[in-house]
Amino acid sequence: MMSQTFIKKEGIAQSFLARYLLSEKCGNRLKTIELLSKECELSVGLMQAALKSLEQAQAVGIKRRGRNGSFLAQINHKLLLEYADIGNVVCAMPLPYTRAYEGLASGLKILCAGVPFYFAHMRGSDIRIECLLNGVYDLAVTSRLAAEQHPENKDLYIALSLGTQSYTDRHRLIFRHGEMESIRRVGLDSTSADQKIMTKQYFAGKDIELVEVSYHECLNQIIKGHIDAAIWNVGQGHKLIAQGLMTQLPDDSECFIKASEAVILARKDNIPIQQLLHTMVDRDLLLTHQQNVVAGIIEPVY
């Protein structure tokens, strides 16, 4: 009877090989078993047995060419992911205060059925990105603007981009009726990377005072007269005119467009998670689900 120790070690070898193979493409020359066993610190025999079991399960097909080496001929990403032993997947999401965010969360949950997929909802894209980079979470949803402007974006990988207005509607300048020319105090939530970047660009060269305000309080603070204006995503259900407020849509500057696009981020070195997303999530199906949630056709489940 095969020992439990051998079975456990073969499982480790399978997981190691699966993670390695997920980063390879068909036609690529593979590392030798000797080199892989050295990297994994397991015997050559164990690595050979693990590779054979992956081939027998039809997770991969290997073409062996003697001295020229072995090449990846066929790959089944879904099967390999089962062997990769990824475990729970946690995605950092914005707080679900819009139907668009709820639609994304619900769509991801449904498309990743069969994988233990969970969400951590938190305010502030910089915080979500930091948690991703520090290994606290596996994925993070932010705007394209926040992802590209983050100081450590070289360590980020945009695993999926969803197009304009998939994250928010276009942001607008919100101010009290008839008071656009007298804007001096501008609300800013320092935890919102998007709002910081857009506010800085919109008011460049203008004599204003930035006032720290929670993003969700911007409208109330303008109405009460504590601030004069804010760059804000109007979204659904806000009767601005009835509240004595006006909006102005900024020019089609690149940063305002990028702030409306949702992207799903992974760490650049986390190939299995990137492959998981590519394998499980169909972009068009995700967007259709989101649009149906926004339209009220279906209720979000996440």
Give the location of each predicted region:
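A short alpha-helical element within helix-turn-helix/winged-helix DNA-binding domains
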Residues: 27-40, 54
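Short coil turns linking two alpha-helices in DNA-binding domains
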Residues: 41-50
